[in-house]
Amino acid sequence: MTAKRQKKEKDVIDLMLDQLDFHGMTKDELTGKDGLLRQLTSRFYERILNAEMDEHLGYKKHDNAGDHSGNSRNGYSEKTVILDDNSTAEIAVPRDRNSTFEPLIIPKHEKRTPLFNDQIISMYSYGMSCRDIQRHLQEVYGVTVSADLISHVTEAVMLDA
């Protein structure tokens, strides 16, 4: 990742944080069960799951390309996930009509986030290309993911920043 891109991404995060007024907020309002950090974490995972669904279906939400495609979005199901610090977060997991969507960031029937998902974001932040990340995940974890999925995941995270 170039220094210019790192600066731009840092600026986006700083702009987002500048919009928040932390003055007078209690610890519970920031880090508690329904606190700001938990809400941001939930939104972060939901963005990634929606990017995964876009990749799975081959089109973005509300895109006409999905008309008569044989499979489409079919709402959401609520899921409680256990985070790295053993706290929990509620997230909305997208569903498809054919029930063929297999999320990678939080797999079906799993309540914990796999390590490699944190690795995608970490490797991307260190400047690795989508293809490099794809190759690394395959070699180290035995996980096959498309470069397009990695691209969608990182784009979704940046949009939410």
Where are these regions (language model features)?
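Subset of Sec-pathway N-terminal targeting signals
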Residues: 1-77, 83-85
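Electropositive nucleic-acid engagement tracts
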Residues: 60-73, 129-161
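Basic, short loop/linker segments at the boundary and entry of helix-turn-helix/winged-helix-like folds
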Residues: 70-126, 145-147, 151-155
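Short hinge/gating elements
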Residues: 26-39, 102-107, 114-118, 137-139
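Short polybasic/polar patches that bind polyanions
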Residues: 55, 124, 139
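Hydrophobic (often cysteine-bearing) scaffold residues that line and stabilize catalytic clefts
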Residues: 41, 45, 116-117, 129
